[in-house]
Design a protein with these regions (language model features):
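Conserved N-terminal subdomain of the carbohydrate kinase-like
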Residues: 72, 76-164, 191
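A short helix->loop->beta-strand "cap" motif at the edges of active sites that frequently abuts
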Residues: 185-190, 265-269
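Short pre-catalytic strand/loop immediately N-terminal to key active-site residues, enriched for Gly-Thr
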Residues: 46-56, 297-311
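Conserved post-catalytic alpha-helical subdomain immediately downstream of the catalytic base
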Residues: 300-354
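Histidine-anchored nucleotide/phosphate-binding helix
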Residues: 58-68, 177-183
Length: 354
């Protein structure tokens, strides 16, 4: 008899009861969900004797924020089939995120079979926040994604969001992200991408090479680095410039940068970035720039006190995606995105639960 194939469809990995029916545009994203451990009362990690446990991760935060705004939102990931993995899924489901395609793995599928973890030391006043990641050999980094039918996974969706964090985790994740981008393009999904560079996961050059490779498949670009676009690519971290881009640009500077992107990647339909002004560890201001429909727009400036800064960029992304899905006018799009980020800074936890 012929040997039985090890390839399985997404639905065979997980109980289909974990989905629910909604209407409207359908959104899907893919990434790692992590256990977050935070010392209470702004304590430093070296002082901590106990931790508050919650869950988060860039793509999961976006899925949850959109679900809370009423969008049909699905999250695809790999977690261990144990109490921690199931608790992460339960947290997503409790916030109306579809988890049907999520994969729960056994030790024979991912040898370490663990959930990624990170420790957050919340800043206060002049002391900034600090993060320590413990996500090496997590379940998603060791899973064989050739078992996943991406055509089936993306069937029926309108929008796919991906980031530069997931491909930084491991080679298998890089392959998955590129394959998802290509499949999404074939199926006609709108694709958003956030480079989201993490220096603890890979080098600047590795990130730049990979993220630049992704650009031809992207419709909506969030953030403007790290990409191969500039003549002096070695001078990316001096003064108030990064990757040849000013950290706090004028309107004219930002318009010129956007035009540079569009000249090289005319398939881009929208580019947006937010700009942060840090007055202290507990007070910031935000505004944003967006290129859309041939014009550059500048948002209002929002100033706010910070309860929890983690997930502010994800809230910006989810706000923009929501506004685009609902056909907001351009200025309303960018103002809603910045307002979403600002309000997230007043909410404890990773996600913008409003």
């Amino acid at each position: 008899m012929p040997e039985k194939s090890n390839r399985r469809t997404v639905m065979e990995h997980f109980n289909p009861i974990l989905g629910h029916e909604t209407t409207g545009p359908k959104f899907i994203t893919c990434g790692e969900i992590m256990l977050r451990l935070t010392p209470p009362n702004y304590e430093k990690l070296r002082m901590a004797t106990n931790f508050e446990a919650s869950y988060g991760g860039s793509e999961a935060n976006i899925a949850l924020a959109l679900a809370n705004l009423g969008v049909d939102s699905t999250f695809f990931s790999v977690v261990p089939n144990n109490s921690l993995g199931k608790s992460a899924v339960r947290w997503l489901r409790s916030n109306d995120v579809h988890c049907t395609p999520m994969i729960l793995t056994e030790p024979d599928e991912t040898p370490s079979n663990r959930l990624g973890t990170y420790y957050l030391e919340t800043g206060y006043g002049i002391r900034p926040s600090k993060v320590i990641y413990d996500r090496k050999h997590s379940a998603i980094t060791e899973y064989d994604f050739s078992q996943v039918d991406l055509n089936e996974l993306l069937e029926g969706f309108d929008w796919l969001h991906l980031s530069g964090i997931t491909p930084a985790l491991a080679p298998n994740c890089r392959g998955l992200i590129i394959d998802m981008l290509k499949e999404a393009k074939k199926k006609g999904l709108t694709v958003s991408f956030d480079g989201n560079f993490r220096s603890t996961l890979w080098t600047w050059d590795e990130a730049r090479d990979f993220c630049t490779e992704c650009l031809p498949y992207v419709d909506v670009l969030l953030g403007i680095e790290p990409y191969h676009l500039w003549k002096d690519e070695n001078d990316h971290s001096k003064g108030d410039w990064k990757d040849g881009v000013p950290l706090q640009p004028s309107y004219e500077q930002q318009d010129e940068i956007f035009q540079h992107f569009i000249e090289r990647y005319p398939s881009l339909k929208c580019i947006a970035r937010h700009v942060r002004y840090a007055h202290s560890g507990s007070e910031n201001s935000l505004k944003a720039f967006m290129w859309y429909d041939g014009h550059t727009f500048e948002s209002k400036l929002f100033t706010f006190n910070i309860l929890d800064r983690v997930g502010g960029g994800d809230a910006f992304a989810s706000g923009l995606i929501y506004a685009m899905l609902h056909n907001y006018k351009a200025m309303d799009m960018i103002n809603f995105a910045v307002a979403s980020s600002a309000i997230k800074h007043t909410i404890h936890g990773d996600a913008n639960i409003t």
